[in-house]
UniProtKB/Swiss-Prot annotation:
Known partners and oligomeric status: Homodimer.
HAMAP family assigned to the protein according to its UniProt record, in alphabetical order: His_tRNA_synth
Subcellular location: Cytoplasm
Keywords linked to the UniProt accession: Aminoacyl-tRNA synthetase, ATP-binding, Cytoplasm, Ligase, Nucleotide-binding, Protein biosynthesis
Pfam families: HGTP_anticodon, tRNA-synt_His
Name of the protein: Histidine--tRNA ligase
One Gene Ontology cellular component annotation held by this UniProt entry: cytoplasm
Superkingdom classification of source: Bacteria
A GO MF label: histidine-tRNA ligase activity
NCBIfam families: hisS
The keyword Aminoacyl-tRNA synthetase appears for this protein: yes
E.C. no: 6.1.1.21
Recorded catalytic activity of this chain's protein: tRNA(His) + L-histidine + ATP = L-histidyl-tRNA(His) + AMP + diphosphate + H(+)
């Protein structure tokens, strides 16, 4: 038997209902905030992610599905969504058009990770990206949108905030952090030893418990912010408080991608094990320029759909549509034509096996149809259809031409 690849799951039945429910809710709320849908290719040039996500990141260094295609192009399956949206933004010259551009997307991403609960090799993200607005009020709007989505889905969360500073306040902080980590060079893991050389701030994202305990004493970036970054972060906290969105400060929150600056945030859940992050994002004002566009302020977030599917509280399923069945072969020939007509306005589940009425009712109930409609010899003779409402249990016989 051929099975799906490890870490790449099928989505069907109840999972599909949860998946589509999430997409419906998230799309509705993103559109309320004035965002428009964008779709980018699954396959991109590898250079896109090396320049955006960062060559020092785990994603680029360890996790990408990368290969050389038949045209000798170095390509990879997208590991995240933001870089592709920024590439499209620059390629379509929207960075030169001025104004504010807001997009949302959803689709499959790919990372060669060790599969575990809440972490797959093919997974789906919903994300939003805003270009052209530098105000911290836009950062707050991103957080409020994510909060609205989670609340409508019935998902509880804790919101964690940090500021990663800017080009002015990051260099002196980086020097302080390097000095601190160097003092502990014999205690930290191999990944952190490598990160100190490539991107020191990423050591704070280490999941090694020993490293985490060491970094609790590390210098705090919030204590090194320039006046502008400090003012923006204070304003962000004020906006969230005014809108009754609770948050906690996490000074070690740096996100897993190299392009973030200033605002960084994560929504976490205590109900899905070690992979607790269910949404996250922040500001990335330099990324458009990194990808050869004009300097453009930008902010966004992404949500891991599979992780959220474990937490979604689904609305009670309602019976809907018609189950249509025949009691003999002559009736079976008739119901196909009747079903085709009815499908122009309603859901119709057609049963191709002839059964007695009792068995048709059982099958209709299992199908979650609201109505069971059956034709037998008497109905053929009278030109009628017998219909039962499976919710209120009422029955009626109507002319087939009126069905």
């Amino acid at each position: 038997m051929i099975s799906s690849l490890r870490g790449m799951n099928d989505i069907l039945s109840e999972d599909y209902e949860r998946f589509t429910h999430f997409i419906t809710v998230a799309t509705k709320i993103a559109q309320r905030y004035g965002f428009h849908f964008i779709e980018t290719p699954l396959l991109e040039e590898t250079a896109l992610f090396k320049r955006s996500v960062g060559e020092s990141s785990d994603i680029v260094g360890k996790e990408m599905y990368q290969f050389v295609d038949k045209g000798e192009n170095d390509v990879c399956l997208r590991p995240e969504g933001t870089a592709g949206v920024v590439r499209a933004f620059v390629q379509k010259k929207l960075d030169r058009a001025g104004g504010i551009h807001r997009f949302f997307y959803h689709g499959a991403m790919f990372r060669y990770e060790r599969p575990q609960k809440g972490r797959l090799r093919q997974f789906h993200q919903f994300g939003v990206e805003s270009f052209g607005e530098s105000s911290v009020y836009e950062d707050a709007s991103m957080i409020m949108m994510a909060s609205d989505i989670l609340k409508e889905l019935g998902i509880g969360y804790r919101l964690q905030l940090n500021s990663l500073g800017c080009n002015e306040c990051m260099p002196p902080y980086r020097e302080k952090l390097i000095n601190f980590v160097t003092k502990h060079k014999d205690e930290i893991c191999e990944d952190c030893t490598r990160r100190v050389e490539t991107n020191p701030i990423r050591v704070l994202d280490c999941k090694n418990e020993k490293c985490q305990s060491i970094y609790t004493e590390a210098p705090k970036l919030l204590n090194c912010l320039c006046s502008t970054c400090e003012s923006d972060f204070t304003t962000l906290k004020m906006i969230l408080k005014q809108n009754e969105i609770d948050f906690e400060i996490d000074t070690n929150l740096v996100r897993g991608l190299d392009y973030y600056s200033k605002t960084a945030f994560e929504f976490v859940s205590d109900n899905i094990g070690s992979q607790s992050a269910i949404a996250g994002g922040g500001r990335y004002d330099r990324l458009v320029e990194f990808l050869d566009g004009r300097p453009t302020p930008a902010v966004g977030f992404a949500m891991g759909i599979e992780r959220l599917m474990e937490l979604i509280i689904m609305p009670e399923a309602k019976k809907d549509g018609y189950y249509l069945g025949a009691m003999d072969d002559e009736a079976l020939d008739m119901i196909v034509k009747i079903a085709q007509k009815k499908r122009k306005s309603d859901i119709v589940i057609l049963e191709y096996k002839t059964k007695n009425l009792k068995n048709h009712l059982k099958a209709a109930d299992k199908s979650n149809a609201k109505y069971c409609a059956v034709i037998g010899s008497n109905e053929i003779k009278d030109g009628t259809i017998w219909v039962k409402n499976l919710e209120d249990k009422t029955e009626k016989t109507i002319l087939s031409e009126l069905f």
